């Protein structure tokens, strides 16, 4: 079906994709819902238009393109590296604006030179916007989830807390609430006395046996939920999390890291200074960050319009490293956003690990910006 009501710059956009060796790909509007519900993040999940097939399979209207493009790549067993471009409608429940709108973008799959691929994604996004919005000064905000993960890991927190904090990356309200819980732990309450005693004892085998007896008494079916072993391990994890306290020094280290907000040209020095002062070894995460900055400079990207903000993330759970957004200087309207998602294709069923990075344009916002010229 031909696309209608495309913005007047659509042909320019398609020409840019061709010049950048990105193959145009189409994906179905009706998508399996499960991948989006599992890994797209809470912000997107609550905006999805859900439906189901005659057989009861959960389906949804396409809420974004990255997951569908990756699924199509896996289905066609196409080799890598491969660059895909897309332009089409997505469907989301939004407070402001239409519930269906056009997005376009590029997904770069399988390039093992991560630094250059990251730099190319930012360069493509800003280069295309510069053509569509001549004379406008662009501003790029850049974050890196891998650096945040390295900081959290270096602090030696239990794995459960690391996962919670990493999951909240980019959502400062949620992150601050979790940090408050770490400073003032809330102990587990409301458990049956016998269960509480067994959890505290650390005797997993006895706890599982007790839970199995209780489940049999109440007629609880494991087919409808978690097994006794899963429940026991979840209770144990909750106890560990509730008893973990972040000391003041570690709390201030995290606060200091999250407050970093510097021009990208100064970011490597700022991160190195932070790590040295805190006595943390950030290892490969810092090396990859520095490599990306060098690649951006070598690619001719104007670093003066890029800022690094340590707390900056994007509300999609599949990002693993670089994240970025592009606006017109002085505006809050995000015109392009993207990042690295190295684990997504494996999660979706790819047999090999495929590194990936990409970005999307919000065409309605670009159109509004062009009209304001």
Curated annotation (Swiss-Prot):
InterPro entries per UniProt: aa-tRNA-synth_II, aa-tRNA-synth_II/BPL/LPL, HisRS-like_core, HisRS/HisZ, HisZ
Keyword terms: Amino-acid biosynthesis, Cytoplasm, Histidine biosynthesis
GO cellular component: cytoplasm
One GO term (biological process): histidyl-tRNA aminoacylation
Principal localisation: cytoplasm
Signal peptide as annotated in the record: none
GO MF annotations in UniProt: histidine-tRNA ligase activity
Pfam hit, one: tRNA-synt_His
Compartment(s) where it occurs, according to its Swiss-Prot or TrEMBL record: Cytoplasm
Pathway assignment: Amino-acid biosynthesis; L-histidine biosynthesis; L-histidine from 5-phospho-alpha-D-ribose 1-diphosphate: step 1/9
Subunit relationships: Heteromultimer composed of HisG and HisZ subunits.
Additional remarks: This function is generally fulfilled by the C-terminal part of HisG, which is missing in some bacteria such as this one.
Function as written in the Swiss-Prot or TrEMBL entry: Required for the first step of histidine biosynthesis. May allow the feedback regulation of ATP phosphoribosyltransferase activity by histidine.
Homology family: Belongs to the class-II aminoacyl-tRNA synthetase family. HisZ subfamily.
PANTHER family reported in the protein's UniProt record: HISTIDINE--TRNA LIGASE, MITOCHONDRIAL-RELATED (PTHR43707:SF1), HISTIDYL-TRNA SYNTHETASE (PTHR43707)
Annotated protein name in UniProt: ATP phosphoribosyltransferase regulatory subunit
Protein's organism: Rhizobium johnstonii (strain DSM 114642 / LMG 32736 / 3841)
Taxonomic placement: Bacteria, Pseudomonadati, Pseudomonadota, Alphaproteobacteria, Hyphomicrobiales
Gene name linked to the record: hisZ
């Amino acid at each position: 079906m031909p696309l209608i009501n495309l913005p007047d710059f659509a042909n320019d956009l398609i020409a840019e994709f061709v010049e950048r060796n990105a193959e145009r790909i189409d994906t179905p509007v009706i998508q399996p819902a499960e991948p989006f519900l599992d890994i797209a993040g809470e912000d997107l999940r609550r905006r999805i238009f859900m439906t189901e097939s005659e057989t009861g399979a959960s389906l949804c209207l396409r809420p974004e393109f990255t997951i569908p493009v990756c699924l199509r790549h896996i289905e066609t067993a196409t080799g890598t590296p491969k660059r895909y471009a897309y332009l089409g409608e997505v469907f989301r429940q939004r407070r402001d604006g239409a519930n269906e709108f056009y997005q376009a973008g590029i997904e770069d799959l399988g390039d093992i030179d991560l630094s250059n691929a990251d730099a190319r994604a930012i360069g493509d996004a800003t280069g295309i916007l510069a053509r569509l919005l001549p004379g406008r000064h662009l501003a790029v905000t850049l974050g890196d989830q891998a650096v945040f993960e390295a900081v959290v890991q270096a602090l030696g927190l239990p794995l459960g807390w690391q996962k919670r904090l990493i999951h909240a990356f980019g959502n400062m309200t949620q992150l601050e609430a979790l940090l408050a819980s770490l400073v003032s732990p809330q102990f587990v309450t409301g458990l049956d006395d016998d269960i509480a005693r067994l959890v505290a004892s650390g005797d997993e085998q006895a706890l599982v046996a007790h839970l199995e007896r209780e489940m049999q008494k109440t007629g609880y079916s494991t087919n409808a939920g978690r097994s006794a072993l899963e429940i026991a391990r979840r209770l144990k994890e909750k106890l560990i999390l509730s008893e973990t306290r972040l000391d003041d020094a570690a709390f201030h280290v995290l606060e200091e890291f999250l407050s970093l907000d510097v021009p990208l040209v100064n970011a490597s020095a700022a991160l190195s200074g932070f790590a040295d002062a805190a006595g943390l070894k950030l290892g490969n995460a810092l090396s990859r960050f520095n490599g990306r900055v060098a690649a951006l400079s070598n690619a001719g990207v104007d670093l003066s319009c890029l800022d690094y903000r340590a707390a900056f993330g994007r509300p999609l759970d599949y990002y693993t490293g670089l994240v970025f957004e592009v606006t017109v200087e002085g505006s809050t309207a995000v015109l392009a956003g993207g990042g690295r998602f190295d684990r997504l294709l494996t999660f979706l069923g790819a047999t090999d690990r495929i590194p990936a990075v990409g970005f999307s344009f919000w065409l309605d916002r670009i159109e509004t910006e062009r009209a304001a010229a």
